[in-house]
Structures are given as C-alpha cells and as structure tokens.
C-alpha cells in the first residue's frame, strides 16, 4: 500500500481496513488468486435443474444427436464457455453438424447459488445437455433410460462419478454396479446407442492419498466395465481424464475447469469420437493457452463520501466473479502506477468505502474481477477528490 500515497502514516491503517472487509469467496481459496492469464470451491451437491428447455426432436435427420451427461464440471457456471462449447465448435470446424440434446441448457450461478443462468461467455452454440451441479451416477442411473427415450441421442458422452466418490463415499463394488445399471438403462431405451465415458479428471482433493486412490479405482472400473460391456451394436469407449489437466493452471477453484481446462476435457472426448467412431478429427495440438478469469469488464463509479477522507466505490458485477481486487493511486501525490490492495472483496461488498484518504487529493481507482483463483477483466478507471 506504500505507493498508494493515502498518507504515509495511514498506509498500514488502510491495509487493516482492507483486511477487515475482505473475505474469501464462498468455498474458494481466494488468497492464492492468480492475475489474468495465469492460472478452491468444493464440489458441492446442489439441487439439479428441473425444467425441460428443449422439446424432443421429431426427426433425427442426418445430424448426429449427442447428449452430454455430467455434473458441475460439465454444466459450468456464470461466465463460462463450458467444455461442451469447445467440443461443439471443434466438431463444427470439422464439418460435423451435431445436434446437442437433453433436458437442460443453462449455467449455474456460482455467485448467487441459483440455477438457470444464461451468461455464457459465448451463447451462440447448442447448449442443451443433461448436466447439472450435484448430479451423481447413483441417481442418474435411475432416470437415464427415460431421458434417452425422450431425446433419442445417438451418442452419450458421460462424465460422472466425482460426487458419488467425494460426497457419498461409495466403494468400488457399488460404483461398478451403478455404472452397469446406467449402461443397461440407456441401452434398454436405445439399443444401438454409442457411449463414451470420461475418466474423472484430476482435482485438488486428489492430493489426499485416500481420495486419489478412490478416483484411480473408479477410473479403472470405468475402463474395465467399458471393455467388458462394449458390444458391436452398442460400443463403449473411454476418454482420458482431461488430456493432461494441470490442477494449478486449468481449474479455477481446484475442481472446475477454466478456459484451458475446458479445452483439455473437450479434447479427450473429441479424440475418442474421431478414433473410435470416425466423428470429426482429433483435437488439434498443441492446445492454445487462453486467457482465464472473468471476461466482462466491471463498470466502476466512485463518488466522495459524506464522511471526510472517504470515497464510495460501486461497480456492475461481472458474470461468475465472486471477488474483486481494488487498485488505487494518488494522482495528486504523483503516483503513476496503481497499487493493488492486499485482499479481494467478495461480490457482496459492492458498494465499498475507501477510507483514510488524504483530504483534497485526487485518487484514481479500478477493480479487477476474479473467479476463484483466476483474475481477469479490469474495470474502467474512475477518479474522485477526497473530501
């Protein structure tokens, strides 16, 4: 805070104020927030969406019908592209015109903790699917037959099981039985369905040896079950566990993928669709390195407070941003660069009062939106003269 020049005597006090008001994003480790383009919320089971947003198609036509089945890793949250978007765009570029089907088609609002958010980073894709935060294999096995009968997918792309292991602690015999039941139910509704199972990708919880062993065991179960139950009429393939996901770089909260993690999950499924089913080509490598963090720039306004030496900041929230860093410089004192306050503010702290300013000095502020540990778009700078 030394170069913010809010009065050298008050620098420590300003830092103390920032510490007092800054709290971690719900479930996220914001203390390790990353700057834009660099690289933890727990995987909570939440209520699944219930409203059907896509009516069953009357005719399949020549386009392959794909239904993606998954949990929060697949559904995504506010401001995301999602890995479904990455796969869909890849297939389109390959000349494949997939028809994405399923009962859902929206994001989870990770800030307000509600469903039916439509703030996709790019909404111009087919986002129908069967993916929801909290979805678990042991529940989905009982309803997948009805969904397959309704939406008639040619391909099921499935990434499930993490919630079963992490939240419910099922052992491998139960997981294997549930997996077999899922396959049987899907085939009963559509005997020639093609299924691709994704392996559980790496996440921060797998740093614990016991949970890592549980995930590794289930991934082996997926592979062995696919081999055992695959048939010529209804083949089953297995996609890799995220094509080399780096937990520190590719997940915004240690579990859910950012833009770079999305690409790696999509690539795993794309490669299997190409090699096993001749649907498109393998995902091109090397994978691009994409910017991470919120993409929408917050709109900042600032005004003098009615209290001396204070200013009130408010900003329009960016989709998915659960926290914001405040940057400040004292223009009157001659500061040429912004100094970031040491701790992020949660979204609920908008508006926020900056205190311990020097009366009569003009200050410039800006805020940076962060989603978990990924910090992205900056606001416009806004200036005020301290009362």
Where are these regions (language model features)?
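Secretory targeting and sorting signals
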Residues: 1-36
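Histidine-centered active-site loop/cap adjacent to the catalytic His
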Residues: 69, 250-297
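Conserved SGNH/GDSL esterase-like catalytic core that processes O-acyl groups on lipids
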Residues: 74-177
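Active-site segments of SGNH/GDSL-like serine hydrolases
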Residues: 159-163, 184-217, 240-242
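Substrate-gating cap/lid alpha-helix
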Residues: 202-240, 262-263, 268
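Pro/Thr/Ser/Gly-rich low-complexity, intrinsically disordered linker/stalk tracts
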Residues: 278-320, 359, 374-387
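Recognizes extended acidic, P/S/T-rich segments that occur
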Residues: 325-358
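Beta-strand-rich modules
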Residues: 354-373
């Amino acid at each position: 805070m030394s170069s913010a020049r809010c009065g050298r005597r008050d620098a420590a006090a300003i830092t103390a104020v920032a510490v007092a008001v800054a709290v971690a994003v719900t479930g996220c480790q914001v203390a390790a927030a990353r700057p834009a383009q660099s690289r933890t919320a727990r995987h909570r089971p939440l209520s699944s969406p219930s409203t059907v947003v896509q009516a069953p198609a009357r005719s399949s036509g020549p386009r392959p019908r794909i239904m993606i089945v998954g949990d929060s890793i697949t559904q995504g949250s506010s401001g995301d592209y999602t890995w479904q978007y990455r796969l869909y765009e890849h297939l389109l570029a390959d000349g494949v015109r997939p028809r994405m089907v399923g009962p859902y088609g929206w994001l989870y609002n990770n800030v307000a903790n509600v469903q039916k958010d439509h703030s996709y980073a790019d909404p111009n894709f087919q986002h129908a699917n069967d993916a929801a935060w909290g979805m678990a294999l042991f529940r989905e096995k009982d309803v997948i037959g009805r969904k397959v009968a309704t939406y008639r997918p040619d391909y099921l792309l499935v990434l499930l099981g993490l919630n079963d292991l992490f939240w419910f602690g099922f052992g491998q015999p139960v997981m294997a039985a549930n997996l077999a039941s899922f396959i049987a139910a899907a085939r009963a509704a559509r005997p020639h369905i093609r299924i691709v199972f994704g392996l559980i990708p790496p996440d921060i919880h797998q740093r614990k040896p016991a949970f890592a062993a549980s995930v590794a065991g289930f991934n082996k179960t997926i592979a062995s079950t696919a081999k055992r139950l695959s048939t010529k009429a209804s083949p089953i393939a297995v996609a890799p566990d995220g094509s080399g996901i780096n937990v520190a770089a590719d997940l915004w909260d240690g579990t859910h993928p950012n833009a770079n993690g999305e690409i790696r999950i999509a690539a795993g499924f794309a490669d299997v669709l190409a090699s096993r089913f001749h649907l498109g080509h393998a995902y091109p490598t090397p994978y691009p390195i994409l910017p991470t963090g919120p993409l929408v720039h917050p709109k900042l306004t600032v005004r003098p407070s009615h209290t001396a030496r204070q200013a009130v900041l408010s900003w329009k929230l960016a989709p998915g941003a659960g926290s914001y860093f405040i940057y400040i410089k004292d223009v009157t004192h001659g500061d040429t660069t912004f100094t970031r306050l040491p701790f992020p503010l949660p979204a609920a702290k908008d508006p926020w009062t900056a205190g311990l300013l020097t009366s009569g000095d003009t200050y410039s502020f800006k805020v940076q939106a962060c989603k978990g540990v990924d910090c992205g778009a900056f606001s416009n700078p806004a200036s005020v003269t301290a009362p």
